[in-house]
């Protein structure tokens, strides 16, 4: 730098930390020159990279590393309190519409609004690009927590108004009473705050959601069943089966066909109601391959039964997702041609 005309410096390289362990850092800055253009100062910053930082460069708040350390150091003494997981709604749109610099400005002002609302006994951490966690270890009162959220919202609205509504945004929050950390652990704690914030956003954003154990367990159940469905589809539709509901000609007392129904048995939960697993197939997109498998099984079964009952017919149900997202007519014709089953 001393021998060039460059005024900026930005370089990644390795240092040794206090334990003589190598760490990657980024050093960047701007050169201040004197009257004769001689370099006088290098103003900038040095950041550790390739590892989680202790503090956030944009807001100056401590980061998740510090939050995790605090909990691990305090696990035996914390017996009450709450967490508020705050997220800026649609923050990506702020960056896209106004640029990253303005997005950073919104982050700093949001942090400032939070800091102006919390008490000396409360702490705030920056844990993700647009998310913060407020920690209170003095009260487990959920009304106190929700009132704090409302207070922060008012300060943010005031900031937006003072900024001439250049960008209008809201925040959502998930509120979690502190559980027994010796039983729960830090990783599970963060999963629960993530769930609470997600629920607040699913409820329409610009609101807070207080953690409910029953809803969380249902969320875990849905996630596990969805994972099992993925695994089943990837392993030859293991766990799926079909059953037949007879269709009778009452006047002739004769079996004429059947409605074919799909069933799924979970390794962990046992038989799952179609009212539960079919919507999961639809939302995950697995209904397309599963529907083809179901169609194939029904047609194959029909062909075998026709050896005994020549005019036997089967009825199958299809999903709206199959109709709109796949060429279901082509699939049906292809499966019938492959089985040698003529249409009724």
Enumerate the predicted regions with their spans.
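Active-site core of bacterial EAL-family cyclic-dinucleotide phosphodiesterase domains
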Residues: 14, 221-280, 317
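Catalytic core of bacterial c-di-GMP phosphodiesterases, primarily the EAL and HD-GYP domains
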Residues: 26, 218, 252-259, 284-344
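Short loop/turn elements at sensory-signaling interfaces that couple input to output
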Residues: 27-43, 255, 266
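Catalytic strand-loop-helix junctions within cyclic-nucleotide turnover domains
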Residues: 34, 135-145, 161-166, 170-189, ...
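C-di-GMP signaling machinery
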Residues: 48-51, 199-241, 251, 281-285, ...
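Conserved long alpha-helical elements within nucleotide-processing catalytic cores of c-di-GMP signaling
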Residues: 53-82, 89-119, 125-129, 133-134, ...
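Catalytic core regions of nucleotide second-messenger enzymes
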Residues: 125-128, 156-172, 201, 270, ...
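Catalytic-core segments of nucleotide cyclases and related cyclic-nucleotide turnover enzymes
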Residues: 149-150, 163-165, 170, 178-205, ...
């Amino acid at each position: 730098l001393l021998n060039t005309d460059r005024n900026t410096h930005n370089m990644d390289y390795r240092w040794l930390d206090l334990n003589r362990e190598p760490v990657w850092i980024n050093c960047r800055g701007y050169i201040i020159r004197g009257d004769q253009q001689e370099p006088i100062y290098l103003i900038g910053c040095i950041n550790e990279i390739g590892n989680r930082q202790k503090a956030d460069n944009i807001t100056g708040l401590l980061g998740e590393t510090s939050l995790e350390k605090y909990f691990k150091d305090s696990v035996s003494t914390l017996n009450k309190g709450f967490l508020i997981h705050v997220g800026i709604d649609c923050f990506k749109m702020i960056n896209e519409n106004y640029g990253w610099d303005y997005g950073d400005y919104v982050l700093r002002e949001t942090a400032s609004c939070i800091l102006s609302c919390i008490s000396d006994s409360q702490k705030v951490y920056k844990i993700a690009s647009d998310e913060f966690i407020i920690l209170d270890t003095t009260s487990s009162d959920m009304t106190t927590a929700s009132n704090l959220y409302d207070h922060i919202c008012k300060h943010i609205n005031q900031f937006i108004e003072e900024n001439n509504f250049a960008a209008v945004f809201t925040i959502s929050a998930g509120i979690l009473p502190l559980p027994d950390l010796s039983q729960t652990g830090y990783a599970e704690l963060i999963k629960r705050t993530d769930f609470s914030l997600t629920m607040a956003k699913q409820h329409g954003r610009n609101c807070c959601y207080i953690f409910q154990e029953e809803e969380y367990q249902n969320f875990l159940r849905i996630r596990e069943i969805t994972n099992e469905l993925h695994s089943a589809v990837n392993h030859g539709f293991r766990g799926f089966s079909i059953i037949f509901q007879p269709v009778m000609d009452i006047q002739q007392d004769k079996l004429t066909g059947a409605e074919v129904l799909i069933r799924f048995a979970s390794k962990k939960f046992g038989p799952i109601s179609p009212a539960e697993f079919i919507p999961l197939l639809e939302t995950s997109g697995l209904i397309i391959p599963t529907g083809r498998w179901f169609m194939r099984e029904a047609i194959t079964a029909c062909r075998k039964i026709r050896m005994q009952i020549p005019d036997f017919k089967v009825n199958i149900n299809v999903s709206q997702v199959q109709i709109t997202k796949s060429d279901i007519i082509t699939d049906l014709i292809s499966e019938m041609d492959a089985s040698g089953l003529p249409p009724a």
